[in-house]
């Protein structure tokens, strides 16, 4: 029933508890599910007695009642371009911006920590959040210890392109090196500051357009980096890559275990509701430990009710009065309602380019 629903509606998304990686390991060891928040965010472990680390072998993690205080994203292609233009080491410039994000997160924790529990009695006084049994005049700082804060990354494909003119499909080695470096630094910051920092694959619904404008303003139009009105979200291959669903799963698996603060993997199914194909790819994704989305371009005619994948004109009645549903990044969204788009122009351009998204 689940596969049948996904192949017709693109929901539900699928979370592996039996495969590889962080989420499955929490379930296998503790019987705890790390449920995704929103379209892709995951909480880091917080243990009942030990906090950031287990007090002993019997200590168990808690995920219910916790939250994320926000994500701040690195503009990786721009950081690389800045380092090159100023003849600086890329990692030196990257360190500067990572430290900047770190200080912003610390400031956010400090600012929120001064708030009184009375600002949200249901969450902070009546047990809505973990530890939320404070008095109305108590400050909420103790509750924030179990809250995560994310270092986001976008445009990893464009970083690889600006580095050596190759995409993540063609190469990807530099991108892997950078992600390993960022992940290591985030973990160091976490231990030093005592806050639950995590690395997050930013969906960048609007940021993907803003970052292009920022890049062009300083460094102009660079082929395969800033020549489109959008950049790739998080660690995904470029949407225009003519690759198979299996190839896309394998290519993105390289980055999967480095981004435990937030991630989703999805492929486009050009298979016209082929249930067996969808099921096969979903089972493969579960074996690989993915949080997997099924991507179709769902369309239906508002005049005659005809449904079809990815139509712009109804073949039955000739109407352009269509409703279309596409995956925005992690969420589903109406790319057309009664013939008109509800998405930003840069996002609509990305949707037009999709072959393997």
Model-derived features: positions:
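Conserved catalytic cores of very large enzyme subunits
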Residues: 1-145, 166-168, 172-327, 333-335
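Contiguous, well-ordered alpha-helical segments that form the cores/surfaces of helical PPI scaffolds
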Residues: 149-162, 180
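Phosphate-handling catalytic cores of nucleic-acid transaction enzymes
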Residues: 318-320, 331, 335-352
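Intrinsically disordered, low-complexity regions enriched in Pro/Ser/Thr
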Residues: 354-357
């Amino acid at each position: 029933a689940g596969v049948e629903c996904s192949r017709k509606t693109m929901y539900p998304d699928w979370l592996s508890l039996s495969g590889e990686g962080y989420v499955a390991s929490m379930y296998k060891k503790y019987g705890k599910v790390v449920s995704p928040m929103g379209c892709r965010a995951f909480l880091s472990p917080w243990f009942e007695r030990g906090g950031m680390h287990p007090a002993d072998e019997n200590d168990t993690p808690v995920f219910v009642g916790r939250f994320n205080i926000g994500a701040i994203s690195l503009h990786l292609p721009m950081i690389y371009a800045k380092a090159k233009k100023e003849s600086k080491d890329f990692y030196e410039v990257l360190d500067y911006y990572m430290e900047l994000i770190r200080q912003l997160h610390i400031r956010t924790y400090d600012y929120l920590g001064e708030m009184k529990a009375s600002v949200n009695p249901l969450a902070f006084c009546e047990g809505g959040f973990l530890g939320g049994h404070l008095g109305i005049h108590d400050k909420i700082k103790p509750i924030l210890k179990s809250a995560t804060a994310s270092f986001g990354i976008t445009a990893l494909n464009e970083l690889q392109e600006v580095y050596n003119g190759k995409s993540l499909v063609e190469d990807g080695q530099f991108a892997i090196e950078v992600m390993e470096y960022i992940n290591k630094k985030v973990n160091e910051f976490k231990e030093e500051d005592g806050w639950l920092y995590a690395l997050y694959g930013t969906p960048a619904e609007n940021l993907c357009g803003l970052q292009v404008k920022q890049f062009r303003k300083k460094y102009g139009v660079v082929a395969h980096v800033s020549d489109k009105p959008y950049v790739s979200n998080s660690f995904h291959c470029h949407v225009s890559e003519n690759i198979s669903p299996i190839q896309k799963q394998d290519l993105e698996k390289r980055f999967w275990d480095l981004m435990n603060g937030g991630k989703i993997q999805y492929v486009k199914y050009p298979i016209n509701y082929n249930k067996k194909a969808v099921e096969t790819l979903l089972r493969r994704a579960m074996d690989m430990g993915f949080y997997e989305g099924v991507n179709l371009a769902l369309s239906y005619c508002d005049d005659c009710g005809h449904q079809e994948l990815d139509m712009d004109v109804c073949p039955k009645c000739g109407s352009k009065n269509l409703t279309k549903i596409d995956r925005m990044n992690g969420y589903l969204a109406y790319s057309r309602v009664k013939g008109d788009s509800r998405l930003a122009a840069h996002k609509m351009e990305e949707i037009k380019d999709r072959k393997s998204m």
